[in-house]
């Protein structure tokens, strides 16, 4: 787990890391956020699912500089959240989010991106 400088974390952040979780500089993480970089095995051939091995080869999580993660967000393995993006409250991040985007929902999807020429957020 690598946490950059100027990161602000409120209460109840859970990070489950078997590979690599990297949080860039000046990231804001709201309450009750869950980050995991692996999956639990799901073979029905074992006695119970608890006995399945972890799939630690899935891939890490990267949260780039200046990102804002809202309350109750879940971030799943093998994703990058691009620089200065915003992830709305209650979202489940299952795939990477481009830089300078706003993503919401389950699964999280981009609803806005920042237009540097117009200097405004544009709806997608």
What feature does the model see in each segment?
Residues 1-79, 114-115, 120-121:
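Flexible, glycine/small-residue-enriched loop-and-beta-strand segment within the central core
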Residues 78-109, 116, 120-122:
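C-terminal/domain-terminus segments
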């Amino acid at each position: 787990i690598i946490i950059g400088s100027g990161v602000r974390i409120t209460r109840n952040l859970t990070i489950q890391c078997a590979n690599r979780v990297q949080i860039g500089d000046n990231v804001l993480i709201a309450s009750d956020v869950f980050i995991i970089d692996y999956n639990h095995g799901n073979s029905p051939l074992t006695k119970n699912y608890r006995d399945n091995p972890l799939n630690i080869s899935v891939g890490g999580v990267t949260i780039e500089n200046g990102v804002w993660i809202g309350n109750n967000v879940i971030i799943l393995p093998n994703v990058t959240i691009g620089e200065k993006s915003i992830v709305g409250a209650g979202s489940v991040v299952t795939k990477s989010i481009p830089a300078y985007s706003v993503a919401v929902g389950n699964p999280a999807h981009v609803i806005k991106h920042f237009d540097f020429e117009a200097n405004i957020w544009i709806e997608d």
